[in-house]
């Protein structure tokens, strides 16, 4: 399946607003401002197999994952750019799995910004039969954000990777 289009973000009444990603690591800041509408192309290629979907381009993100609020702020559903990268969705009688890499920025030699990507895993292990009236699950959620790169020349020791996770029953 192929999908294409345009993603638009426009704050009515705002003439200037920061183009900062509020979900990032604290030291990684954007200093630019945007005016008018924020337009991005949208493209998704999806291959569906028996119990696995492979998605490339704009991936299914945001609230589709069911991440807990400390890992994903629901306000980002309205303000964040669409996630782009690669995603694996799998479903079986004993597990639901969503694994992805959201590539926010790549770098070339002598770029003035860092490469940035987020890797995530959201799973739900099912402990009893799907036909059961009572269900017991063990969720596992992991989110890692990386900033830096092999050819990053901005400053020394500027590579950062932060990881957080949640397990429950």
Write out the residue ranges for each language-model feature.
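Transmembrane beta-strands of outer-membrane beta-barrel pores
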Residues: 6-12, 49, 58-63, 92, ...
């Amino acid at each position: 399946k192929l999908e294409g289009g345009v993603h638009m973000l426009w704050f009515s009444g705002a003439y200037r607003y920061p183009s900062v990603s509020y979900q990032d690591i604290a030291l990684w800041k954007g200093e630019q401002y945007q005016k008018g509408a924020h337009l991005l192309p949208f493209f998704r290629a999806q291959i569906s197999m028996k119990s696995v979907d492979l998605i490339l381009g704009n991936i299914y993100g945001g609230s589709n994952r069911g991440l807990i609020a400390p890992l994903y702020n629901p306000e980002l559903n309205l303000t964040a750019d669409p996630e782009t990268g690669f995603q694996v969705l799998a479903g079986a009688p004993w597990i639901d799995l969503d694994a992805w890499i959201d590539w926010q920025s790549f770098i070339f030699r002598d770029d003035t910004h860092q490469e940035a990507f987020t890797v995530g895993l959201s799973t739900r292990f099912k402990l009893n039969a799907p036909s059961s009236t009572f269900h017991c699950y063990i969720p596992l959620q992991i989110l890692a954000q990386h900033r830096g790169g092999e050819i990053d020349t901005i400053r020394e020791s500027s590579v950062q990777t932060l990881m957080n996770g949640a397990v429950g029953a």
